[in-house]
Structure formats: structure tokens, C-alpha cells
Amino acid sequence: MLLSSGYFKRHKTKKRHRSLSALILSLLFAVSLFGGCSADINSAESSSPNGEVTPPEVIVESPGPVEMPAEQEVPEVPEIDFNVVKPNELGEVMVIMYHNLGDKNTDYARTAESFRADLERLYEMGFRTLPLRDLVKGNITTPAGYTPVVLTFDDGHITNFKLLEDQTIDPDCVVGIMSAFAEEHPDFGMHATFFFNGGTPFAQKDSVAFKFNYMLENGMDIGNHSFGHEHFKPLSAHEVEAALGKNAVQLKKLLPENYEIDLLALPYGERPAEGQRGTLIEGQYEGVPYKNIAILNVGWKPSVSPFDVSFDFASIQRVQSGDGHLQLTDWLDGYAANPDKRFISDGRADRVAIPAILSEKVDLTGFEGLELLEY
């Protein structure tokens, strides 16, 4: 059955396709045949959604009316075979936590070769990258039958994004590897969020502007990791505000005016005392406010779906990269054995499709414009 709810309202747009040349020829032909007929032309022009000027309406008084080309609707996403795709948009979503690349694999470092292998395995298993913001807003644009995955990188290490002496992107840094992979597999995407502390992002002062522009142009985001990588547990509310607000202010100076620093990865996974935790969500620094829409833990398991009744944007679990127990490789092995646990998209960003047996677990409160389909 269909229930209305959801986060964004989407409007279907019809495009009008008219041939100006055909209209003019038809008009001239009608005038030449019926000299006594008059033509009343409306001179008002309008613009279509793609910026093209729509030719004026032409009204010809003649025994035979001028036929206008039929309106053509934008093709809709074809409906899926639910018995084949078996969408489950209450399944688990991995938010993967990386840090830097290194010469050997550790709990916080991944070799370039292993990172490439991670991307390849994710792709082959049907995962496709999704922006963190889209996840928390319920804007799941993942194709039908595939699973969204969110890639995150903490600390802004130079191995995340490095320029060589000739100012080309190092093919063995994270962004270089992702760029090359996306060229070969464009449907995988390049969506990822990089979380920064104070100091020079990616440790190359003269290239910060280029790097940030490149990231934003290619679907990557910038997030907050606190100014000094503070331990939040002993801090007061004022100290937490300073750590987050100061870093947000510094990052915004390097970004377009309308870009929001509203994504937070908790350093060390720590939170302040119970009464101070509201400052993780919002606060201000020297009169400049900040407000986070996603707060990430240093987790050890996948996140629940954003449509799950237990989802909490202020406490999103992450999967640690690596090959050990409860790290990325371990979880991928688990999904290979139990694929039904994964979030499986129905291919419709304006709809949430779930097996009817899970109806008690869904909660679309706060998501406007979405439809719920149970099957």
C-alpha cells in the first residue's frame, strides 16, 4: 500500500518541443491559400526549464487548424520487478571510516593497493557511493538493486589528496585513486566526505583552493573534525563550542560562501558529559553559529537505514577500514553470505520500498515528499 510522507518535494517537469520552422511554414501556407483569413500571434515568449525560449503560440483562423506537435513527457524511472530486485530500504548502510594511506595496513592506515582493492570489491558487490548529506536527508539516488555506501576520511592527511611537483594529482593518493576508478567505473561515483582539523588541509598550503574546488566539483564534501582533535569527554559546553565553531569558521573561509560545515566526525569517538552534548549538534563561536546534520562515531558496525525507527543523525555508526575482526573485509564477507541484510534501493529517490513484514520498523517522520511502499 502507499502512504504519503518524506523529506523533499519533487516536481515532475514536462518539456515542450516545438519546431519554429514548421510553424512558420504552416502559417505562410495557410495565409497564401486563404487570403481572407487573419492570424493573431501572441508575442509573449516563455522559457522552458532548460533555459530554451519557447516559440510564441500561433493561432490561425482557417478551415483546417494548424496541428501542434504533441507534448512529450520526461521519461519516468521504469517500475521494477519487485520479485527480482527485492528492495529493502530498511537494510544496513555502511559508512566506512578511513584515515590515511601508508606503506602497510594497520587499524588506521591502508596501502594504496588495498584501498584500490576495497573499491573494486565494493563495486563488484553492488555498492555505489552516496553523499553523507543525502543519506541523512533520505535522498537515496542509488540505482535499483544496488546498495549505497558512504566513504569518509578523517584528519585531512596529505595521502588523502596530494599534488606532485608538476602539480598533477598523485595517482597513489585517495583522490587520485578514486578519480581513476570513477573514470573506469563512472556509475560507482566519487562521493566521499573528508573531515579536517585546524591547520592546512592536506598539508600543502599553496594548493588548498585547487583541492577544495576539485573536491566540490566531483561530488566530495568537507566536514568538521574539531580544531585541535580534542578529547571531548572532559570538556565544558563552552570548550566544545570553541573546538567545533573555530574549526567551522576557519574551513568556511576556504569554501564558497553558501557552503555549510554541517557534518561532524567525532575525534576519538568521544562525547562530552551528558548535559553538554547538545553543543555537538549546534552552538556558536564568537557570534558565528554552527549546526550539524550528521554526527559520526568511531564505530565498528554499519549504520541502520535513515528510515529505520532507531536511526539517530547525532550518533551514526561507522565501519572501520581494514581486514580484521569487525572491520571492512569482515563485514563484506558477512554481506556475501547474508545479502538480505543490506539496504537494497528501489531506484526511486521519492519512495521508500520495504518488505511488508518490516512495516513496524519504518519511521518517515521529518522526511517530506516521500512515499512508503510495502510489498
What does each model-identified segment do?
Residues 55-152, 163-165, 169, 234-375:
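C-terminal active-site subregion of NodB/CE4 polysaccharide deacetylases
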Residues 223-234:
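Substrate-binding clefts and substrate-entry loops adjacent to catalytic sites
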Residues 38-40:
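Bacterial signal peptide processing site
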Residues 1-16:
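N-terminal secretory signal peptides that target proteins for export/translocation
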Residues 142, 179-189, 203-223, 305-311:
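Acidic (Asp/Glu)-rich catalytic clusters
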Residues 162-183, 191-194:
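A short alpha/beta connector and helix-capping loop motif
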Residues 34-36:
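C-terminal motif of bacterial Sec signal peptides marking the signal peptidase cleavage site
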Residues 24-32:
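Bacterial N-terminal signal peptides
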